[in-house]
Amino acid sequence: MEGDVLSGFGDRHNMDGKLLQSFQKSFVDVQDILDQNRLLINEINQNHESKQPDNLGRNVGLIKELNNNIRRVASLYGDLSHSFARSVDASSEGESSGTLKSDGKANQKRFRSG
């Protein structure tokens, strides 16, 4: 029985590791998009300063790409927020449900009001 209780901790550690990897990948994706946006903004500014009709026309496409990237970043942050909230909910459910310690005694958490 004690092995069953302790094996749950290993599963939790693996789950936390996967969650952390997922968060890290999302943050890397966001940073890549933000870096791309910085390049787009620089090009848009250069085109604007040149005042050449072809460059100004190209800005239309660049601005659309910039807007799409902003939507992608907002979506990624929304997904991150949702995943984080879900993981916190799952974590708090596990902690408040009364688990067994490795010595077999119940582990009930008390919450103070206030």
Curated annotation (Swiss-Prot):
Factors inducing expression: Follows a light-dependent circadian-regulated expression with a small peak in the evening, about 12 hours after dawn.
Known role: Component of the central CCA1/LHY-TOC1 feedback loop in the circadian clock that promotes clock accuracy and is required for sustained rhythms in the absence of daily light/dark cycles.
Organism whose genome encodes this protein: Arabidopsis thaliana (Mouse-ear cress)
Keywords attached to this entry: Biological rhythms, Nucleus
Family named by the database record: Belongs to the EARLY FLOWERING 4 family.
Domain of life, per lineage: Eukaryota
Subcellular locations according to the entry: Nucleus
Protein name as annotated: Protein ELF4-LIKE 4
Coiled-coil residue windows: none
Chain intervals with Polar residues compositional bias: 89-100
GO terms for biological process, alphabetical: photoperiodism; positive regulation of circadian rhythm; rhythmic process
Predominant place of localization: nucleus
